[in-house]
C-alpha cells in the first residue's frame, strides 16, 4: 500500500479512497482470480470440516470405541487448535507471507484428513485432529488479508458476498451432505470430503497468490513468545467454555484449572505487550468505535446461528430422526444463497449502505424465529421449509452486510497501509468468530437444559396420584400395553413410563419455544447495535468510481 496512507489520521476519506484505488489492481487477472477462489474455498472448508466433525462425532466415537467423556474431547481438540493458531497466524503470516503458510498448511491438512478415518487409536486420533485444526485454522485469517489487497474495487462487493455465502452455506449444507455420505457411502467421507477439496484450494493458491518478498537478512526476527502466551491462553479458555456444561462448571477442578491457566497466560501476554511491543501486532489499531461494535455484532451473529445449528436439528432429533432426515429442514437455508449473494453484491455496488443490508438480514432472522416459535411435537422437517427460506435470506443478508462493514472499516481505518495492521484486524475477527460460535452454542445448550428442567417440574405438578385425569390416563395406557406385558403390574409400570416420556417430550418442546424466542430477541439486540454503528465515509460504489476515474486524474496531473 502506498505510504501516503500511513498517516491516515491526517488524511480525509477521499484521500484514503484514492490511495486505496491506486494500490489495488484495477483490472482482474487470472492470478488474483485464482487466489480469491482459493481463499474463498479455504474459508468455507474450515467451517464445513468443523460442522461435519460435530455431526459425525457419534460415528467417530463408535469407530474408536471410546466412552462419552473421552469422545467429548475429540471436538474440542480440533476447535481448540483452530483457536490457538488464529492469533499465531499473525506472526507466521508477517514472517513468511500468506502463500507459504497456506500451501504448507493445506498440504498437511489434506494428508491428515485422508488418514483420519483409518486411525483406531484414541490418542493418535486426538493428535491428528489437533494437526487438522492447526493447519486449517490458518485459512480464515489470511483470506481476508489477501482479498483486500488484490481484488479490484468493482469486484469487491461480489467477492464479499461469495465469501460470506461459502462460510454460511457450509453450516447449512453440512447435515444433508453428511446424511447422504452416511447413507450411500460411509461416515469416512466427513474427512475425505475435505481431503478432496483442499488440493483444489492449493492449486488456486499456488497460481493465484504471489510469493512474499524476501525478508532482509539483517532484519531482526520478531519474538513469538507473546503470540504463544496469547494463543495458548485463548485455546485454554475456549476448551474450558466448550467443556463447561459437561464438567459442571466451577464444581470441576479441570474446568477451574483450564480457566485460571488461560486467564494467567492472557495476563502474561498483556504484560509482555506492555513491556516489549511486537512489531507484528497493532492492538491500539483495534481500539476504534466501529471495530469494537463490529466485533460484538459478529459475536451476536454467531449466536443467532444456533437456530439452524441447534434448535431445529434438536427439535426434530427428539423424535429419533437421523441426519439425512433432519438435513432437508436446514438445507433450505442454503437454497437461496447464490441468488442472494449476487443481489447483495449488486446492491452494495449501487451504493447501498451495508448497515441497511445487515439490519434487513437480522430482521428476517427475527421474523423466522417468531414463526418457528409455533413449533409443536407434531412438526416434521417439512414444517420448517418456508421459515428456513426466510432464515436463509436473513443469514445471507446479515453476514454479507456484516463482512461488508468490516471491510470498509479495515479500509477507512487505514488497515491496508501496514501489513501488521490488517493481519491483526483479521486475527481479531477470526478469534471473535470462534469464540462467538462456541460460546453461543454452549449457552444455548445450557439454556435449553435449564428450561427443560423448569418445564418438566411445572408440567409434573399437574400429574399427581389420586387425580382422576391421571388415573384415567394410566388405566387407558395400561389396558393398551397389557397384551404385550408380563402382567398387570408390568403394564402399569409401562403406562407410567409412557406418561413420563410424554411429559419430557412436551417439556423439550416448550424449551425449544423459549430458545426460538431468545434468538428472536437476540436479533432485536443486534439491530440496536447496528443502529449504533457510524456510517462509513464512502461506500463500495464510491470506491469503484474512484478506481474507474483514476487514469483520467493521473493524465490530468501529468
Model-derived features: positions:
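Hydrophobic transmembrane architecture of multi-pass small-molecule transporters
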Residues: 18, 412-416, 428-558
Amino acid at each position: 500500500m502506498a505510504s501516503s496512507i500511513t498517516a491516515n489520521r491526517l488524511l480525509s476519506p477521499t484521500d484514503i479512497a484514492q490511495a486505496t484505488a491506486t494500490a489495488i489492481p484495477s483490472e482482474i487477472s487470472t492470478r488474483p482470480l485464482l487466489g480469491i477462489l482459493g481463499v474463498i474455498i479455504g474459508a468455507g472448508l474450515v467451517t464445513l470440516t468443523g460442522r461435519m466433525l460435530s455431526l459425525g462425532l457419534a460415528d467417530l466415537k463408535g469407530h474408536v470405541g471410546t466412552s462419552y467423556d473421552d469422545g467429548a474431547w475429540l471436538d474440542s481438540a480440533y476447535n481448540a487448535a483452530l483457536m490457538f493458531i488464529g492469533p499465531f497466524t499473525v506472526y507466521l503470516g508477517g514472517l513468511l507471507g500468506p502463500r507459504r503458510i497456506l500451501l504448507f498448511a493445506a498440504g498437511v491438512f489434506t494428508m491428515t484428513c485422508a488418514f483420519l478415518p483409518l486411525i483406531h487409536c484414541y490418542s493418535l486420533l486426538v493428535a491428528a485432529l489437533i494437526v487438522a485444526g492447526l493447519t486449517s485454522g490458518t485459512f480464515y485469517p489470511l483470506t481476508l488479508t489477501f482479498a483486500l489487497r488484490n481484488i479490484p474495487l468493482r469486484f469487491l462487493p461480489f467477492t464479499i458476498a461469495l465469501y460470506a455465502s461459502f462460510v454460511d452455506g457450509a453450516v447449512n449444507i453440512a447435515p444433508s451432505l453428511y446424511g447422504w455420505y452416511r447413507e450411500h457411502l460411509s461416515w469416512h467421507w466427513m474427512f475425505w470430503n475435505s481431503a478432496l477439496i483442499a488440493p483444489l484450494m492449493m492449486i488456486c493458491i499456488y497460481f493465484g497468490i504471489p510469493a512474499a518478498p524476501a525478508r532482509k537478512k539483517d532484519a531482526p526476527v520478531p519474538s513469538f513468545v507473546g503470540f504463544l502466551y496469547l494463543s495458548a491462553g485463548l485455546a485454554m479458555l475456549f476448551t474450558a467454555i466448550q467443556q463447561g456444561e459437561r464438567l459442571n462448571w466451577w464444581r470441576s477442578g479441570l474446568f477451574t484449572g483450564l480457566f485460571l491457566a488461560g486467564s494467567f497466560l492472557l495476563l502474561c501476554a498483556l504484560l509482555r505487550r506492555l513491556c516489549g511491543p511486537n512489531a507484528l501486532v497493532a492492538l491500539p489499531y483495534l481500539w476504534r468505535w466501529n471495530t469494537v461494535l463490529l466485533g460484538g455484532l459478529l459475536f451476536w451473529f454467531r449466536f443467532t446461528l444456533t437456530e439452524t445449528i441447534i434448535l431445529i436439528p434438536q427439535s426434530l432429533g427428539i423424535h429419533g430422526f437421523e441426519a439425512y432426515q433432519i438435513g432437508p429442514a436446514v438445507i433450505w437455508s442454503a437454497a437461496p444463497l447464490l441468488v442472494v449473494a449476487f443481489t447483495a453484491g449488486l446492491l452494495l455496488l449501487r451504493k447501498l449502505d451495508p448497515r441497511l443490508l445487515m439490519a434487513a438480514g437480522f430482521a428476517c432472522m427475527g421474523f423466522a424465529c417468531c414463526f418457528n416459535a409455533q413449533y409443536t411435537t407434531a412438526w416434521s422437517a417439512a414444517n420448517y421449509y418456508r421459515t428456513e427460506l426466510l432464515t436463509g435470506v436473513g443469514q445471507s443478508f446479515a453476514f454479507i452486510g456484516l463482512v461488508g462493514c468490516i471491510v470498509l472499516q479495515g479500509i477507512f481505518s487505514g488497515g491496508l497501509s501496514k501489513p501488521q495492521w490488517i493481519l491483526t484486524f483479521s486475527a481479531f475477527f477470526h478469534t471473535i468468530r470462534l469464540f462467538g460460535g462456541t460460546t453461543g452454542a454452549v449457552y444455548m445448550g445450557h439454556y435449553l437444559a435449564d428450561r427443560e428442567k423448569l418445564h418438566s417440574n411445572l408440567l409434573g405438578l399437574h400429574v399427581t396420584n389420586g387425580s382422576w385425569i391421571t388415573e384415567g390416563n394410566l388405566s387407558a395406557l395400561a389396558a393398551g400395553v397389557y397384551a404385550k406385558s408380563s402382567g398387570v403390574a408390568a403394564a402399569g409400570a409401562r403406562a407410567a413410563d409412557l406418561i413420563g416420556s410424554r411429559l419430557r417430550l412436551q417439556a423439550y418442546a416448550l424449551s425449544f419455544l423459549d430458545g426460538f424466542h431468545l434468538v428472536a430477541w437476540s436479533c432485536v439486540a443486534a439491530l440496536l447495535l447496528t443502529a449504533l454503528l457510524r456510517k462509513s465515509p464512502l461506500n463500495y460504489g464510491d470506491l469503484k468510481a474512484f478506481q474507474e476515474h483514476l487514469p483520467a486524474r493521473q493524465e490530468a496531473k501529468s
